[in-house]
From Swiss-Prot:
Main subcellular location: membrane
GO molecular function (one): quinone binding
Biological role: NDH-1 shuttles electrons from NADH, via FMN and iron-sulfur (Fe-S) centers, to quinones in the respiratory chain. The immediate electron acceptor for the enzyme in this species is believed to be a menaquinone. Couples the redox reaction to proton translocation (for every two electrons transferred, four hydrogen ions are translocated across the cytoplasmic membrane), and thus conserves the redox energy in a proton gradient.
Gene Ontology CC annotation, any one: plasma membrane
UniProt topology in membrane: Peripheral membrane protein
Family: Belongs to the complex I 49 kDa subunit family.
Name of the top EC class for this enzyme: translocase
Protein's recorded name: NADH-quinone oxidoreductase subunit D 1
HAMAP family hit by this protein: NDH1_NuoD (MF_01358)
Record-linked InterPro entries: NADH_Q_OxRdtase_suD, NDH1_su_D/H, NiFe-Hase_large
Assembly information from the UniProt record: NDH-1 is composed of 14 different subunits. Subunits NuoB, C, D, E, F, and G constitute the peripheral sector of the complex.
Keywords, ordered alphabetically: Cell membrane, Membrane, NAD, Quinone, Translocase, Transport
Subcellular location: Cell membrane
Length: 404
């Protein structure tokens, strides 16, 4: 090639521009910075950068007793605090060797709350994602109205709409309210219809279809390489779901399907979310029908659980147990465990180490959102800048657990 031809090609090559999106930008769904290299409107290179929301939750847990650490686990995936609570206490229960002694009422209640929280979390992602795709108004209002019904159940049951810290090692913090079943029944009556309406509005919107179909595609091999789990993996043809592959809390006894898509695009990530919510409603229905109302809500073990107040007033032994648990907590045998559950965003795992004391020696969390965020180069490169907003919305990360 002559020098003249080389210069001519150089003049024709579009100029590249570096653009920084975030960390304070509504489209990033949190404090995320994405450094983009653009040729015109096309993303040539994408580099996600996290760490702006670091809260030191794992380190904080090392300075709290085993039960106290439950309260900080809520703050990671703040849209799904029940998942954080449950995964952590299950790890501690495994260290103690009491996982088979957890009362059935506590196990079934955990399942109901986990699935309610899954639906609530998905509704946030769908509502805000609808805004990102230009579907202003209807999706977010419908989604948040239905989510508000779930938060009412949480508030009535746990005392908090968010960050309830309701799980305890051995069971639940306190018993269910007398009208718990009625509140969940009322929700189950309206939820299927509302979710179907939201699905019709979003998935059949021609603008959304044009912007999401075949956009931000990730293959099964790429998803595995980036460590994706949950919906972000299941849209690539995999049926991996912790509830099916490694059942916990009796999930093997519930009749539900794991939705699977194969296109791996943004449209599929939204469509599978609706399918998962319908399956969650089926699980809630079955769990509610089999809830042993008169069973204990927490393990009967004075070394681990506070004695009833009336007992403390009349029994010196109960008073001693109460004092010991409040001021010192309980000791956990030395050892290490890894326990994972299926959160709304995928497999959230807890690696917990005990040195035999009353506090964790180490708590390491495997957050599914972290892996989803760092798959953004695959989802963005080769697509338009405007597709970035939708791609981030459909992987649905929560940065409390990314940076923890």
């Amino acid at each position: 090639m002559s020098m003249a031809e080389d210069l001519h090609l150089e003049e024709q090559r579009p100029e590249r521009m570096t653009l920084s999106i975030g960390p304070h930008h509504p489209a990033t769904h949190g404090v995320l910075r994405v450094k983009l290299e653009l040729e015109g409107e096309t993303v040539v290179k994408a580099e996600p950068e996290t760490g702006f929301l670091h809260t030191g939750i794992e380190k904080t847990a090392e300075h709290l007793t085993w039960n106290q650490a439950t309260t900080v686990m809520d703050r990671m995936d703040y849209l799904s605090p029940i998942s954080n609570n449950t995964g952590y206490v299950m790890a501690v229960e495994k260290l103690l060797g009491i996982e088979d002694r957890i009362p059935e009422k506590a196990r079934v209640t955990r399942v109901i709350l986990l699935e309610l929280n899954r639906v609530a979390s998905h509704l946030v992602g769908l509502g805000t994602g609808g805004l990102d795709y230009g579907n202003i108004g209807t999706p977010i209002f419908w989604a948040f109205e239905l989510r508000d019904r779930i938060l009412d159940i949480f508030e009535h049951t746990t005392g908090q709409r968010m960050n309830p810290s309701y799980m305890r090692v051995g069971g639940l913090a306190y018993d269910l309210p007398h009208n718990f079943k009625e509140m969940v029944e009322d929700f189950l009556k309206v939820a299927p219809g509302r979710i179907q309406e939201l699905k019709d509005v979003m998935l059949h919107n021609p603008i959304f279809v044009d912007r999401a179909k075949g956009v931000s595609v990730i293959t099964y091999e790429q998803a595995l390489r980036y460590g994706l789990t949950g919906r972000n993996l299941r849209v690539t043809g995999s049926d991996y779901d912790v509830r099916k592959y490694y059942p916990y809390l009796g999930y093997e006894n519930y009749d539900f399907k794991v939705p699977v898509y194969t296109d791996g695009d943004s449209w599929s990530r939204v469509a599978i979310t609706f399918d998962e919510m319908f399956e969650s409603l089926k699980i809630i229905r079955q769990a509610l029908d089999n809830l042993p109302w008169d069973d204990r809500y927490i393990i009967d073990d004075r070394k681990l659980v506070l004695p009833p107040k009336q007992e403390v007033k009349h029994s010196m032994e109960a008073l001693i147990h109460h004092f010991k648990l409040v001021h010192h907590g309980f000791d956990v045998p030395a050892g290490e465990v890894y326990v994972s559950i299926e959160s709304p965003r995928g497999e959230i795992g807890f690696y917990v180490v005990s040195d035999g004391g009353n506090k964790p020696m180490r708590v390491r969390v495997r957050p599914p959102s972290f892996y989803a965020v760092y798959s953004l180069p695959v989802l963005l490169e080769g697509h338009l800048l405007s597709d970035m907003v939708g791609a981030i919305a459909t992987i649905d990360p929560v940065f409390g657990e990314v940076d923890r």
